[in-house]
Amino acid sequence: MTKISDLPRDLAEEVLSRVPVTYLRAIRFTCKKWNTLTKRRSFTKKLIGQEKAEAKVKEFHAIMTLNSRLHLMSVNLDGIHKDENVESSIKQKGKLISLTVADPDRIVISQVYHCDGLLLCITNEINSRLVVWNPYSGQTRWIEPRTSYREWDIYALGYESKNNAKRSYKILRYLDAYEDMGDMSVEPRTRVCEFEIYSLDTNSWKVIEVTTDWDLCFLHRGVTLKGNTYWFAREKIPPPPRERVIEDIPLGEAEINVEIPSFLLCFDFTIEKFGSRLPLPFRPCVDDTITLSSVREEKLAVLYQRWDITWTGIWISNKIEPNAVSWSKLFFPMGRIRPLEAASGTFFVDEENKLVVLFDKGESILNPTRNTAYIVGEDGYIKPVDLGESVHKYCFPLACSYVPSSVQI
């Protein structure tokens, strides 16, 4: 009697390439032959090709942070306007657990960044830790700090494109804080800005010199596109004197929602420098919400919501480079949705079906207890999809598109 493990290699590859990524780890432990097969370049190429084909036709995968745990989700928006059963359009495929630790459920993830099938995860601990992870292969690399990691550090994962087409993966760490944050009596306040780069090739950190006339906010997540990371940034504004902060400002002297020059910035991992300021297709005020996303890892999308939630819309780039950007017409203005936080509002754009999937909390603003995905379309179309209970009011669901990768770390 023929066993499934005795199938010809080509047929076994065809069968196993259709298995969800979350089950590949279990398959590798099933038999030595399958463990070897799933690590072959031909199998990985077939698996990645199938993932990309599904993404173009109807379904794509996403990595989502739900309640500080990582999950693999499938998103299928094909024919969504005709089907009121929107709950079936977003499904949880499984929890990602291959962090090569004794008890992966004890690893609490506060931030996650995606690049080329790799994830950079930051743990939520008193002393944060960094780990680069390939969920497909199960490989991990825990990154030791040069000094120590801080709660408000900003990170990015990207790669340097070399002449031989080999990609050299790197981490950018940006510390922007006041040395005396714990002692409010200190005057003047000493601000520290420091940039470090970690190379996965050399397994080492180095400090780079960057002169900034702009601010990156910890809550505004960067998006990596073609190996480079883009952020929403604002012109640097000097802090007011301490006594000015604590005294009452005369009525009418303070503006309710001021406009500060805002733009995009790109960090080029090949030359290890920031590019020039890139224009936005709108002029935001301080209390407005801006979040970024990628479209099939080829275009940049930006979501803008006015502070009074009277208007929300998305633009998509038709050209994006470290020193140049041009924007296509507005994708569409959305219907009235709940106020978004800078720490939330991750989203996907489906250009073909003219739909957006926006991840946030439930409709209750004062006591949001449910993680929710909103499927938003033209002419005011909006449908919520419940993603389960939220264990913490300020723990938002965060998502990024995902295609398996054979990258070795």
Curated annotation (Swiss-Prot):
One Pfam assignment: FBA_1
Domain F-box: 1-47
S-S bonds: none
Highest taxon, organism lineage: Eukaryota
Transmembrane segment boundaries: none
UniProt-listed CDD domains: F-box_AtFBW1-like
SMART domains (alphabetical): FBOX
NCBIfam families associated with the record: F_box_assoc_1
Protein's name according to its UniProt entry: F-box protein At3g17320
Organism of provenance: Arabidopsis thaliana (Mouse-ear cress)
